[in-house]
Design a protein with these regions (language model features):
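A broad, low-specificity signal marking well-ordered, structured residues that form hydrophobic/aromatic
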Residues: 4, 29, 57
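Short Gly/Pro-enriched turn/cap motifs at secondary-structure boundaries
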Residues: 8-12
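A short, structured beta-strand/loop element
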Residues: 14-54
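N-terminal nucleophile
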Residues: 2, 13-14, 80-81
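Short Pro/Gly-enriched beta-strand edge/turn motifs at strand-loop
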Residues: 1-7
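Helix-rich interaction surfaces within compact, conserved domain-sized segments
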Residues: 43-81
Length: 81
């Protein structure tokens, strides 16, 4: 698997921070974010199950432009950025 790095939280010190990648082979977005606490996980479970093989992470709103870029990259892989 070859991940294509898209971006990092712009307010970061480059360590231990939210990041976004695209897996072009599997056509998936990959996120590193802050782990959800029990309270947030419980709120998520109120709309459906949270299986053991899934995780809830937080991504700051200031990364919206990076998320859009990742969506565009996976939807249009032929366009070089």
């Amino acid at each position: 698997m070859a991940l294509r790095f898209i971006g990092i939280d712009p307010d970061t010190d480059e360590h231990n921070c939210p990041r976004v990648w695209v897996d072009d082979e599997k056509k998936e977005l990959v996120f590193q974010g802050w782990k959800a606490g029990k309270e947030l996980e419980d709120e998520v479970r109120s709309t459906g199950p949270l299986p053991d093989y899934e995780a809830v992470v937080r991504i700051p709103a200031r990364m919206v432009h990076i998320l859009r870029e990742a969506c565009d990259a996976i939807e249009h892989p032929d366009v070089v950025r």
